[in-house]
């Protein structure tokens, strides 16, 4: 199987999914790619979302590990916390610096299952839903790289990126002079993006909490910007 290079995204998602169905060697991945992609004309109100967040040992998907994954299913009005999922997974690359950020310790990862062992449940939770992240170059690239390393398989999916939505609307609301001077946008970090919609402050760097925060942010963006598709 030809693995797509780091950060390369398919031009045609339907074609990519069809190719992966033919080439997949994992039952869970085969099932994932058999699920049809959401119709591009489907309305927001008819869409099932799942917010994905991860915690890692660093910022480089090719050098660092995932140590925690959080998933929160939701729609444009409701969040289904009873169906939310959270995993801490094993890693040999944990550093004192990363422990200070997310609070996941060597003891936690030593007692945790491997990422490979929980991948089928993660894939099942994502399949058939529109995945939502805050900064796709973290969540999607880390998941893609991990599956490529562990299973020698492609694991890619379309995402809605709340950071990109926020950046787009902030640019649109800039004054002409600010655009001309290439003035820097306000912070796009999840915490500050939420503040602009008067959402409550949550604990940072917990994968489950950040997934919830991302879900709430998209709901606020949908409502405030009257997004329909």
Where do the language-model regions lie?
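The feature marks non-catalytic terminal segments
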Residues: 219-229
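Long, acidic (Asp/Glu-rich), low-complexity accessory segments flanking structured domains
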Residues: 1-15, 25-26
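Alpha-helical transmembrane segments that form the membrane-embedded catalytic/substrate-binding core
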Residues: 208-217
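Generic recognition of well-ordered alpha-helical segments
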Residues: 165-168, 193, 217
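Conserved non-catalytic scaffold segment of RNase H-like nuclease domains
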Residues: 15-52, 56-157, 181-205
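Short alpha-helix plus adjacent loop in nuclease-associated cores
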Residues: 160-182
């Amino acid at each position: 199987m030809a693995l797509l290079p780091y950060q390369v995204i398919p031009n045609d998602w339907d074609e990519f999914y069809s190719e992966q169905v033919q080439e997949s060697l994992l039952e869970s991945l085969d099932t994932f790619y058999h699920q049809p992609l959401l119709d591009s004309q489907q309305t927001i109100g008819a869409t099932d979302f799942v917010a994905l967040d991860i915690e890692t040992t660093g910022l480089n998907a090719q050098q660092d590990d995932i140590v925690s994954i959080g998933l929160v299913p939701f729609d444009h009005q409701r969040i289904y916390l009873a169906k939310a999922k959270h995993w801490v997974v094993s890693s040999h690359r944990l550093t004192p610096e990363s422990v200070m950020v997310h609070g996941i310790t060597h003891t936690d990862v030593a007692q945790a299952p491997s990422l490979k062992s929980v991948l089928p449940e993660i894939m099942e939770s994502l399949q058939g839903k529109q995945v939502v992240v805050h900064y796709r170059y973290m969540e999607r690239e880390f998941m893609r790289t991990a599956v490529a390393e562990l299973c020698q398989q492609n694991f890619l999916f379309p995402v809605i990126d709340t950071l990109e939505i926020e950046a787009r609307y902030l640019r649109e609301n800039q004054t002409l002079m600010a655009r001309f001077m290439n003035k820097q946008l306000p912070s796009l970090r999840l915490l500050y993006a939420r503040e602009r919609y008067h959402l409550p402050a949550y604990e940072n760097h917990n994968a489950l909490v950040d997934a919830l925060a991302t879900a709430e942010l998209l709901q606020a963006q949908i409502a405030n910007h009257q997004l329909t598709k």
